[in-house]
Amino acid sequence: MREAMFYEKLDDNKVRCHICPRHCIIKEGERGFCWNRENINGVLYAVGYGKVCSLAIDPIEKKPLFHFYPTTQVVSLAIGGCNFRCLHCQNWTISQFPPDEIPYREMTPEEIVEVAIRYNCPGISYTYTEPTVYYEFMYDTSVIARENGMFNVMITNGYIEKEPLKALPVDAMNIDIKGNADFYKKVCKATLEPVLETCKLAKKLGIWVEVTNLIVPNYNDNIDDLLFIIHFVRDELGRETPLHFSRFHPDYKLTDVPPTPIETLEMARNLAIEEGLKYVYIGNVPGHEGENTYCPNCGALLIERYIFNAKIINLDVETKRCKICGEKIDIVL
């Protein structure tokens, strides 16, 4: 546990948290919406600090990040809690509980970095739950990781305030854009606009950005919803920004909703390509050609993927160009 960052003290021993757009006002002895920040005698503490509930070595493709050091392995970690209440959460067993009410292992930032060194991982991924709610642990670990020549990636719902994001030593982000404003209100108990602002700010800060949209049947799968996300990515983030359409599987409080039809995912991908996006993917469908990276100019297979295994085919890793036609590929290697 350590004192939280980005908060202010108020009268009557209350505090206001400024880590995310909720700006929770927290009374003494209580916690904020995310369960990770507690007011103890008028001081806000990150009570989930170091309570690591999940630690693994993952292919970076699993995040998913397809254009940021493809084929590499990263240390992936999580601490319990979230600042959303998504009805369809795929990781609800750790995200929808306080960090001290689920199994965890006490770890320090130094120990996380030592794991990365031991397993020759070039980077660390803050993922599985919502990293914003364990910001202090992510921040401290990121600083040490960067000092050791490693990169940091954040897999996030994008619900973070501007100043914390600016201060964070993060190199790449996969940001969920879950649907329209109504979807955020009804399904996530959150608002859309701050997520869009995070996407734009991350791009402006020079962070590598990829976007994921989990398509939930009858919730966010109509053409207007898809076009909204496609046009935002194209017009605000750039045609080169990878967009992942992922398949929903029944979980948590939406177990009565069927899996996303593969035809819907293919329709979304084709629509995005028609609207001008250069790199569009289908996720959670093992073996689908929509997992692969193709040259946006000649269509040559650049990176072949099966589940989370990636193999570079017709991509020149020195020049970042297609070996077939010479097209410059937007990728970090």
From Swiss-Prot:
Question: Which keywords does this chain's UniProt record carry?
Answer: 4Fe-4S, Iron, Iron-sulfur, Metal-binding, S-adenosyl-L-methionine
User: Does the keyword section mention S-adenosyl-L-methionine?
Assistant: yes
Q: Name one GO molecular function term.
A: 4 iron, 4 sulfur cluster binding
Q: How many and how are cofactors bound here?
A: Binds 1 [4Fe-4S] cluster. The cluster is coordinated with 3 cysteines and an exchangeable S-adenosyl-L-methionine.
Task: Tell me which cofactor or cofactors this protein depends on.
Answer: [4Fe-4S] cluster
Which residues participate in [4Fe-4S] cluster binding? C82, C86, C89
Q: Does this entry carry the keyword Cytoplasm?
A: no
Radical SAM core domain residues: 67-274
Q: Which Pfam families match?
A: Radical_SAM
PROSITE patterns found in the cross-reference section: RADICAL_SAM
Record-linked NCBIfam families: AmmeMemoSam_rS
PANTHER family on file: PYRUVATE FORMATE-LYASE 1-ACTIVATING ENZYME, PYRUVATE FORMATE-LYASE-ACTIVATING ENZYME
Query: Protein name, please?
Result: Uncharacterized protein MJ0808
Native species of this protein? Methanocaldococcus jannaschii (strain ATCC 43067 / DSM 2661 / JAL-1 / JCM 10045 / NBRC 100440) (Methanococcus jannaschii)
